[in-house]
């Protein structure tokens, strides 16, 4: 019986071959095809843990991509890498750019909130309760937006908002 890794590699390769075939026959401009190929290569590098290579591919994709939804997705993936690398400020900045391109990405808001909440916990551990409240309030603000965009999708966040007293009555409006 093949290992899960072998099966996953086979699926990845099969998907790549199918995607390449579709891209070749699609009636889209060459520029858009190249943007997609850079994006796809960036995603593959990111999945393999080669973050610097992934960022390079994503940057190339952004130079060519004109579709706002696709640009937002690319920027979101870049922000995830920055977040993984501990570059929180750059991650927040990139998530915000992703939201400018496509405001309907609740995961961007969720992840910004995670950074704010982490900073709040850090302030709390250091005894700075005023700073804690500032960061927790910022987390609540972006998390409330995420929950409005994706009701029921972030139950842990909804519980945090409720338990921390930062939930508003209109959260689902």
From Swiss-Prot:
Record-linked Pfam families: TPR_17, TPR_8
Compartments (UniProt record): Cellular thylakoid membrane
Stored InterPro entries: PSI_Ycf3_assembly, TPR-like_helical_dom_sf, TPR_rpt, Ycf3/AcsC/BcsC/TPR_MFPF
Keyword Cell membrane: no
GO biological process: photosynthesis
Record-level GO cellular component terms: plasma membrane-derived thylakoid membrane
TPR repeats: 35-68, 72-105, 120-153
UniProt KW Repeat keyword: yes
Topological type in the membrane: Peripheral membrane protein
Keywords, in A-Z order: Membrane, Photosynthesis, Repeat, Thylakoid, TPR repeat
SUPFAM superfamilies, per database record: TPR-like (SSF48452)
Domain of life of the native organism: Bacteria
Functional summary from the UniProt entry: Essential for the assembly of the photosystem I (PSI) complex. May act as a chaperone-like factor to guide the assembly of the PSI subunits.
Family: Belongs to the Ycf3 family.
NCBIfam families noted in UniProt: PRK02603.1
Protein name per the record: Photosystem I assembly protein Ycf3
Native organism: Prochlorococcus marinus (strain AS9601)
